Regions:
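Extracytoplasmic cell-surface/polysaccharide-interacting catalytic and binding patches
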Residues: 1-90, 95-188
Length: 188
């Protein structure tokens, strides 16, 4: 099992986290070997988060302090070029990830279908507090059509300067669908 080293976690906390993830896998019918087979890394939840952004409706999105600082700089640089970037999603816990899967299973989707578009609990970059789903007022949220927006083209050309990268390009090795909206902070 690969472990994402982005966030410190005490050995006891890591053991508890792994036990929780294993229980969720069993409950949801996720094959135990799926992370290894797909080359996924365990993403630990940070011990500290800050409000990275608050939407006009009052919804708060949480990130690590470093990711929030980088996001603000990235968003400001884009705005200076007339590009509006919208935060659609940021931190979510492994338990919340499991709830999303439960809802999809309840709607009749199979676990295989779900895991093509959603990481198994414990393995989503969103757990790290460093991943952001980015949208634009140019198109509906979380759709492949985001790649045709000015926002996406700006990100493709500039995000790396702020230590963000596109996590799931076309034909990515992790078995996920193409997610032009999903960007992860890779800085310290």
């Amino acid at each position: 099992m690969h472990i994402n080293q982005m966030q410190p976690m005490l050995a006891e906390q890591l053991d508890d986290y792994l036990s929780r993830i294993r229980r969720i896998f069993v409950e949801l019918g996720i094959p135990e070997d799926l992370p290894t087979a797909r080359g996924l890394e365990l993403c630990r939840e940070p011990t500290e988060l800050v409000v990275g952004e608050t939407r006009p409706q009052g919804r708060e999105f949480y990130l690590t302090a470093a990711a929030a600082t980088a996001w603000h700089a990235l968003k400001l640089a884009a705005a200076e070029e007339g590009i509006a970037l919208l935060m659609v999603s940021a931190f979510r816990s492994a338990d919340y990830q499991a709830d999303i899967i439960r809802r999809k299973l309840g709607k009749g989707q199979t676990i295989d279908e779900i895991l093509r578009v959603l990481a198994p609990p414990g393995y989503s970059e969103h757990h790290s507090g460093r991943a952001i789903d980015i949208g634009s007022d140019e198109c509906p949220e979380l759709g492949e059509q985001f790649e045709n927006t000015r926002a996406f083209h700006w990100l493709a050309n500039n995000a790396q300067r702020f230590e963000f990268c596109l996590s799931f390009p076309r034909d990515n090795p992790f078995g996920y669908v193409y997610e032009p909206w999903h960007w992860c902070y890779r800085g310290d």
